[in-house]
Structure formats: C-alpha cells, structure tokens
Amino acid sequence: MICGIDEVGRGCIFGPVLSAAVVFKKKPNFIKELDDSKKLKKEKREYLSSLILENSYYAFAEISNIIIEKINIHNATLLAMQTAYENLKLNCSLVFVDGKFVPKITAKTVKAIIKGDSIIDEIKAASIIAKVKRDKLMDEYDKIYPLYLLRKNKGYPTKEHKNAIKKYGVLSLHRRNFKLI
C-alpha cells in the first residue's frame, strides 16, 4: 500500500495546521484530474474531495495554534503528518510526504518529496481533502468571527486580515508568536 500525506495551513496566522493521509483502495478512474489543491478551483477541489473520500482510506490530524506556539510550525506540521498517518491505522509499505522533511512514521519506506503535491497522486489527493476540510473549518469560524473575513482569507495574513487584527484585536485562535501578529 502506498500512502500520501500533505498539510495545509502552515503559512496561516489563524487556526490549526491540518494534515491528511490518503491510501487509494484501488487506482481511481479520476486520477488524471488530481493536482496540487492550490492549482484547482474551489468547485473542482470539492468535487474531487468527495470522490477521494469515497475511493480511499483516509485520516486527518489537526494541530492547534496553542501547540504550534509551543513547538513551532515546523514541528507542528511534522506532528500533524505523523498523527494523520497513525490515525489511518494501516501498515503501508511506502509513504510519501510533501516537502523536505520526514515525520516520525513507522513504515518500511518514508520519502519526503519536494513539490510532491504536484507529482505523487496520493499526495495530490491528500492535498485536496486537507484543503477542503480546513477551508470548511475557516468558513465555520467566519460565522463566529465575521469581522476577520476568514471565509475569504482562510486564516492567511492578507492585508484585510492584518487590518482586522489591528482594529479588533487578536483572537484566541490566532498564532500569537507569528511575526505578523
């Protein structure tokens, strides 16, 4: 079994970093439609996400802004990837993770692939379902904190988001040790 893992929210100043791990049950017929989630329009991501969820074993892991502040974003990202894999509860012979660094995963072979979310189908799939899940989470937070425009900025440090922080203050879900806060 081959597993792909990716994260989303690393560059955000609000909310968790979220990782997904994906193992296809069998090679899906939509494989050629997969791409890095950042390159896909929202509607296409959501469509593919539903197909991925139907045709794969998958798991997610979120690491809160509180933990990010304690262990830093790099370590939090690796922990999210490790936890997503552990949550799968599968023994994979090969695990691909997006990026330069390998999390602590007990699999026969674990490889970090730079730009893996554009190269490895399982990482592409993980990228898509992670982005869709985190975007939906930000949409829910937007209902609670509408002045911060989270539906639009998804927690990233846009000009509007930074202006909202200046005007309304830092929320408990902001990553307080990020330089932009």
From Swiss-Prot:
Its cofactor is Mn(2+); Mg(2+). Signal peptide: none annotated. It is found in: Cytoplasm. Residues 1-181 form the RNase H type-2 domain. Gene3D superfamilies: Ribonuclease H-like superfamily/Ribonuclease H (3.30.420.10). Manganese or magnesium. Binds 1 divalent metal ion per monomer in the absence of substrate. May bind a second metal ion after substrate binding. Its EC number is 3.1.26.4. Belongs to the RNase HII family. This is Ribonuclease HII. It comes from Borrelia garinii subsp. bavariensis (strain ATCC BAA-2496 / DSM 23469 / PBi) (Borreliella bavariensis). The lineage of its organism: Bacteria, Pseudomonadati, Spirochaetota, Spirochaetia, Spirochaetales.
